[in-house]
């Protein structure tokens, strides 16, 4: 019976590992000390520093048992890294980098860190890297004399753990509770994972998994970072959304015809409908546009002043924050993009002007000889952030891409037009999605709306790219505009632009004709209400 039970446990363990996705924790080891900081992997064993005990532990990752330990050379031990022969260690109080004999713990070399507040170390096969929490930077330095070779901004305000996986750096940020993938050549944050614990500290890479030690939980986590399943869901909410398109004729003339088109939300990764879409008025018909978007068509005739119509719909939905982790080297080439996707999402449009010499020249200038779809889109994304600033009407609105890129300001719609134009000009399929957004509280009204791009990256499919959201100073903030959708949207529209119903718009489209002079007004808005029990703020009872 015991053998059967043990076999069942083994089978369940193997099954869980097989179904683990990117970001999943596949193993947890209890730290041997109360204040774990730095972490390293030597090809067989983990090494862990503890800042209260002033010790470095050698740990068997298979069993979690301590193999040996020795005292640290200083009294504020933090970062660790293995260079293939020696253990390097950083002391944040002394601000020194030590090269240690892994057998005895003896100091073989001590270097000035050239950092105000060093925290962790990485080794790229030639040079050392370290995080400087006070200056919010990542520093590359010489293992010979400690002198700085390169420096760039850290992902956020609290850089902690650091590791090199053979191509990219990994950096934890304790304020953002994230682990960022960073390009050491540019300093760009490429993607990120939410940390499993609340205080992500040291990092180590074992060739397949990333190890992260959590300073608050006193645990070591083995994290899966390579898998075909790159999506995770977070922050579930259940809400009801009511979308209304209001049209008024104040006269004195007659509105002879009015056609309103309302695209309908459907199940997507970030949203699951809890029931059918319900209409405030019965539509004249249901139609599907050239992009496959389903929508309701409302038709009105001879609206005499004063007249008002308010077609719309409501839906109950479960919405999520959705995150896709993109490791650039695992993205396929342009030749791996399906032909039907290319045929549909590489076409020109009035807002894109793909054949404009300005668009063609700028696209080539930005991308150079790059062939990886991720890097093409990412370079364009960074260009838009560096050269555009957010500005709505009267300066901006829905101008075509060449106008926007020359002007240097953009609405969210114009960010999307510009990214679509430059990506399509280089053979990367791009489209946009339109949404109704929560504005602050879950009971709120949205009359501004929002849209962003989706870029086709093989083999994963459509990945969100929101250059408007990513237009911030911190590298980590920029990364959150790619592959991340917050739990505050219902996506109504999935479109390539230029169809006869929505044109290059989203959430609604409308046309009207009139006889005589007519003063008309129109507005669109989404009303949100949370589902479930009411919420109250109550003080704690006195004991």
Each PLM stretch: what is its role?
Residues 414-507:
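Hydrophobic/aromatic-rich core segments of domains that either
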Residues 32, 48-53, 89-94, 130-135, ...:
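Conserved beta-strand positions in repeat-built beta-propeller and related beta-rich domains
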Residues 24-30, 65-70, 106-111, 147-152, ...:
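A short beta-strand motif characteristic of beta-propeller blades
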Residues 60-64, 101-105, 142-146, 183-187, ...:
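Short loop/turn segments that connect beta-strands within beta-propeller blades
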Residues 31-42, 73-83, 114-125, 155-166, ...:
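Beta-rich, blade/repeat-based domains predominating
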Residues 225-323:
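Intrinsically disordered, low-complexity N-terminal segments that are enriched in acidic
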């Amino acid at each position: 019976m015991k053998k059967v039970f043990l076999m069942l446990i083994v089978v369940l363990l193997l099954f869980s590992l097989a179904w683990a996705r990117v970001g999943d924790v596949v193993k947890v080891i209890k730290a041997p000390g109360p204040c774990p900081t730095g972490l390293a992997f030597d090809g067989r064993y983990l090494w862990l520093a503890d800042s209260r005990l002033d010790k470095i532990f050698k740990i068997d990752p298979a069993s979690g048992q301590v193999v040996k330990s020795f005292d640290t050379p200083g009294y504020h031990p933090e970062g660790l890294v293995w260079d293939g022969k020696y253990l390097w260690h950083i002391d944040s109080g002394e601000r020194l980098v030590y090269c240690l004999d892994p057998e005895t713990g003896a100091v073989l070399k001590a270097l000035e860190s050239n950092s105000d507040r060093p925290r962790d170390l990485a080794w790229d096969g030639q040079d050392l890297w370290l995080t400087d929490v006070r200056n919010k930077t990542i520093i590359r330095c010489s293992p010979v004399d400690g002198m700085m070779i390169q420096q760039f901004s850290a992902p956020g305000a609290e850089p902690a753990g650091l590791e090199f996986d053979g191509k990219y750096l990994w950096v934890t940020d304790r304020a953002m509770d994230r682990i960022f993938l960073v390009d050491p050549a540019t300093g760009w944050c490429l993607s990120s994972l939410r940390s499993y614990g609340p205080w992500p500290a040291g990092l180590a890479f074992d060739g397949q998994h990333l190890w992260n030690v959590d300073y608050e939980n006193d645990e070591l986590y083995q994290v899966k970072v390579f898998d075909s399943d790159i999506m995770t869901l977070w922050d579930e909410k259940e809400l009801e959304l009511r979308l209304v398109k209001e049209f008024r004729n104040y006269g004195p003339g007659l509105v002879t015809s009015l056609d309103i088109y309302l695209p309908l939300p459907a199940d997507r990764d970030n949203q699951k409908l809890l029931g059918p879409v319900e209409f405030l008025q019965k539509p004249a018909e249901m139609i599907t546009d050239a992009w496959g978007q389903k929508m309701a068509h409302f038709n009105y005739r001879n609206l005499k002043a004063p007249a008002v119509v308010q077609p719309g719909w409501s839906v109950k939905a479960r919405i999520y924050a959705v995150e896709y982790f993109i490791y650039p080297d695992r993205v396929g080439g342009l030749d791996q993009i399906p032909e039907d996707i290319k045929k549909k999402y590489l076409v020109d449009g009035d807002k894109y002007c793909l054949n404009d010499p300005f668009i063609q020249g700028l696209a080539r200038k930005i991308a150079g000889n790059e062939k990886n779809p991720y890097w093409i889109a990412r370079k364009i994304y960074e260009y838009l952030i560096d050269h555009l600033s957010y500005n709505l009407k009267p300066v901006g609105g829905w101008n075509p891409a060449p106008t926007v890129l020359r002007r240097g300001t953009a609405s969210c719609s114009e960010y999307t037009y510009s990214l679509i134009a430059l990506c399509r000009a280089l053979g990367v399929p791009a489209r946009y999605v339109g949404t109704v957004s929560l504005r602050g509280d879950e009971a709120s009204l949205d009359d501004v709306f929002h849209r962003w791009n989706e870029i086709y990256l093989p083999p994963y499919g459509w990945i969100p790219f929101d250059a408007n959201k990513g237009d911030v100073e911190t590298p980590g903030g920029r990364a959150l505009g790619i592959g991340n959708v917050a739990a505050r949207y219902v996506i109504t529209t999935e479109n390539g632009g230029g169809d006869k119903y929505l044109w290059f718009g989203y959430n609604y489209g409308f046309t009207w004709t009139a006889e005589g002079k007519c003063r008309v007004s129109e507005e669109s808005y989404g009303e949100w209400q949370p589902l479930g029990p009411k919420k109250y703020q109550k003080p704690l009872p006195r004991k």
